[in-house]
């Protein structure tokens, strides 16, 4: 993992601020070629060009899922923008990303991108672009969230791993170096057949991902990752989860040295 810090950016709070700015500030036309803040679905900052300089990656668009009981109402975009990272701190005040700050604009309408992250998943020392997409797969002909990983080479996305799915359908996943070995793992919130949820940890194994361990079933509705509480990495990894139906907060502890969850 090189010159990277994915800030696990949980976008909603920042996007709410952007929306309020759009509503209450005097409206001026968005400059030609710029991208409105209201069209930002997801963003993160990380070095994806292996030059030691971070970029701002943005999913932009206006789609909304309507045909999925688990993901109904969630947004997806049409474009991946690779931008000057200096603009990240000004997104809420500017109301848009200036055209001159956009290095590349990549059309991803065909795979309905929902979330973008950056991390080194295979230990090659280069950060991959992780995109959660909403689409069918060759051997799984239903619309579902799927984790896709790419290298960014001269403005083009080169596939690294286009997984049909994880072990189970998932609500969300983040990249996090759970065992502090310099390589990022997938941490996902997944559906059980009984309607419950578990948190599962995956690591890269040659040509794909393998489950390291998982939590016991979580008790509570709509768990989500807690980005406000620091997570711990190492032989003992700690991951925080919040629930939408209460102020309940769970700190999950994984003993990775003994491979026990």
Residue ranges and their predicted role:
Residues 4-261:
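Beta-propeller-forming repeat regions
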């Amino acid at each position: 993992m090189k010159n990277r810090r994915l800030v696990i950016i949980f976008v909603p709070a920042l996007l709410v601020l952007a929306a309020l700015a759009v509503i209450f500030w005097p409206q001026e036309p968005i400059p030609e070629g710029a991208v409105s803040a209201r069209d930002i679905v997801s963003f993160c900052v990380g070095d994806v060009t292996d030059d030691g300089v971070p970029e701002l990656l943005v999913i932009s668009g206006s789609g909304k899922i309507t045909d999925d009981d688990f993901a109904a109402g969630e947004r997806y975009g049409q474009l991946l923008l690779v931008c000057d990272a200096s603009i990240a701190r000004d997104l809420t005040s500017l109301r848009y990303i200036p055209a001159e700050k956009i290095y590349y604009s990549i059309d991803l309408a065909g795979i309905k991108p929902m979330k973008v992250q950056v991390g080194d998943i295979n230990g090659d020392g280069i950060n991959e672009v992780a995109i959660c997409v909403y689409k069918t797969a060759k051997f799984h002909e239903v619309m579902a969230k799927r984790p896709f990983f790419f290298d960014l080479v001269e403005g083009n996305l080169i596939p690294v791993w286009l997984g049909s799915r994880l072990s189970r359908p998932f609500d969300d996943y983040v990249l996090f170096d759970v065992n502090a070995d310099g390589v990022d793992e997938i941490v996902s919130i997944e559906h059980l057949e009984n309607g419950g949820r578990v948190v599962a940890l995956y690591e890269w194994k040659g040509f794909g991902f393998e489950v390291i361990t998982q939590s016991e079933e979580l008790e509570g509705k709509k768990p989500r990752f807690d980005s406000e509480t620091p997570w711990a990495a190492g032989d003992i990894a700690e991951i925080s989860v919040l629930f939408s139906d209460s102020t309940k907060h769970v700190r999950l502890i994984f003993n990775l040295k003994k491979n026990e969850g």
